[in-house]
Amino acid sequence: MKDLAFDERGRFVIRDYASRRPFASLLPGIAGPLGIPLWVFYVNRGQAIASFGVENKDNPIMEFEPANRAYQTTPYTGFRTFLKLKREEGTVVYEPFSAWHSADDSQMSIGMNELELQAISAAHGIQTNILYFTLPGEPFSGLVRQVTVTNLGDTPLTLEMLDGMPRVMPYGVDNRGLKEMGRTTEAWMAVFNLDEGVPFYRFQASADDTTEVSEIRAGHFYLAFDESGQGLAPFVDPVVVFGQNTALSAPDEFVVQPLADLCQQRQVTTGRTPCGFFGTSQVLGPGESTTVYGLIGHAGNIEQVRRERARLAQ
């Protein structure tokens, strides 16, 4: 079968994967004797990752959905990449791997502890590669996401990119709370450390129906940087990216505003389900590429993330 093959690295390659019969699988979650494992559930839809978290589905970073629902929701609530492409002939906003760009030439490559996606848009002269793998041997759990955009056109390209997650579940809410009291639990949700460029997502305090309220110090973190190690601007308020488009079908605010203007907007960090996007602007000549590195994971406290940030960017 020409659409199913193994590449030179021994990875199983599925071409045009989103149009195939749906399937679901997991990354191995091996973190080594001193690491902290992360469970990562993926499907052959959208940008593949359907949900992930620590320990079990009651500690999600991306909300857990069973396979039958993940096939439907992953293109919207999974990882998303929005590219604003400006050439001499005009400006367009393009989302690789989306269900409405089915004409793109796409493939999924499945390795032992990695998953890579590729989309080539002949119409826009763009190639997008996304590589996922879990981080072993660290005092925190982490999913690495590497996004590379290549200008396949024969003219220079001015690129603005937003990449990340439309919904990040702060630490402290279980699966039942998300499913049965999702709106109520938003009252406890908060994002800390935004001013330092590494959002830290957790509940402000325990939300259990008990007489005692306990402190929550652990949380989920998200950081991203470019090829030089420079940290990227984070967006945690979905209204800044999507506006009032609660269906998450398109980044309405990013479509109409420059990235620099979005960076200046005030972001609400409490009382709503946050997102996790990072933005960058580049000028790519013909054949040139740019890469963004992201790390999403769980840590015992915010001080641990601050200590490790500089090392991780190297």
Model region roles, listed by residue range:
Residues 1-314:
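Anionic coordination/interaction segments
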